[in-house]
């Protein structure tokens, strides 16, 4: 018994008799409010515990020989698909080789609605050719005229595109397609006239070599000339069909470099740029940071995040001495790699947080209750003393 008596001396929570306890309305209100606060903070702490914690790390990127996937969805409301070409080049200006792509062009009307039910697949570095005749009726070994634009290495023009390229190599303006047999049978003028008031949506993906480079959307047909990438803007063609200015207004619905991961923000998504003048050149300078995202279940996502700076200027589309009109995305790769690792939050931290919430709210509520109780008693005593005198 003496041991138990000594043990009672360490009780930090002495009890009072029920008869000496006073319950008040103020105390009840404080209890209810503090209970609600505890409940809200508890669920907040629980929600925080159930979310995954992401730890960032920084490494030197040692990967070699990888491919870079570029996801594209861009709308050009005032540039017909027949005039628009898409190309990818490396940092040296050479056209990218071994590029896997799945790009489509969707013709749009003035309200940005599809003109046709199906989009046309785009070939990099090539212009689309809508064949309206049966090619079996033509001699496969034929050599048709280039109408004075023949050269030693380009002596036969068996299609309208061949004639146009021969003219470009000579530096001649291609003004009268209706006088050229190849263009007449392929319906070149009808195709251009049909699309002159349309827009174009380009969507799909590119997989290029993981080196600095660019991809761009520009009017005209592209080709390699003396190892230099050339865009023939064909201002004379555009004027002849009513497009006397090149309007490169565009809306970037989506642009990313790789797969999405939780929390990723693509800074160009939803960007809408209006060309205030004709023949504008828009350049997006992109810095790509290789990124690895490791999920809790061990799944590893190898992707990229990027930052971007935009520059625009007016060009002379006819001469091209100030650049060419179009939208150019010039990207370079960071030598550093970011790694994000998902982890579950510690259960002991959760328990510590819950105890802190309960203890803190309980203590503060006790102080508030005591303040209310003793303040009320002091006021009541003053009132009673006033009545007595």
From Swiss-Prot:
Which regions of this chain are Lumenal-facing, per the record's topological domains? Answer: 47-347
Q: Which residues lie on this side of the membrane: Cytoplasmic?
A: 1-25, 369-389
Cystine pairs annotated here are none
Query: What biological-process GO terms show up in the record?
Result: endoplasmic reticulum to Golgi vesicle-mediated transport; retrograde vesicle-mediated transport, Golgi to endoplasmic reticulum
Task: List the GO cellular component terms.
Answer: COPII-coated ER to Golgi transport vesicle; endoplasmic reticulum; endoplasmic reticulum membrane; endoplasmic reticulum-Golgi intermediate compartment membrane; Golgi membrane
Q: State whether keyword Secreted applies.
A: no
Q: What is its main location?
A: endoplasmic reticulum
Keywords tagged on the record: Endoplasmic reticulum, ER-Golgi transport, Golgi apparatus, Membrane, Transmembrane, Transmembrane helix, Transport
Q: Does the keyword Nucleotide-binding apply?
A: no
What is this entry's stated membrane topology? Answer: Multi-pass membrane protein
Where in or outside the cell it occurs: the entry states:
Endoplasmic reticulum-Golgi intermediate compartment membrane; Golgi apparatus, cis-Golgi network membrane; Endoplasmic reticulum membrane
Q: Where are the transmembrane segments?
A: 26-46, 348-368
User: One short Pfam family name for this protein?
Assistant: COPIIcoated_ERV
Describe its function: Possible role in transport between endoplasmic reticulum and Golgi.
Name the family.
Belongs to the ERGIC family.
Question: PANTHER family under this entry?
Answer: ENDOPLASMIC RETICULUM-GOLGI INTERMEDIATE COMPARTMENT PROTEIN, ENDOPLASMIC RETICULUM-GOLGI INTERMEDIATE COMPARTMENT PROTEIN 3
Q: What is the official name of this protein in its record?
A: Endoplasmic reticulum-Golgi intermediate compartment protein 3
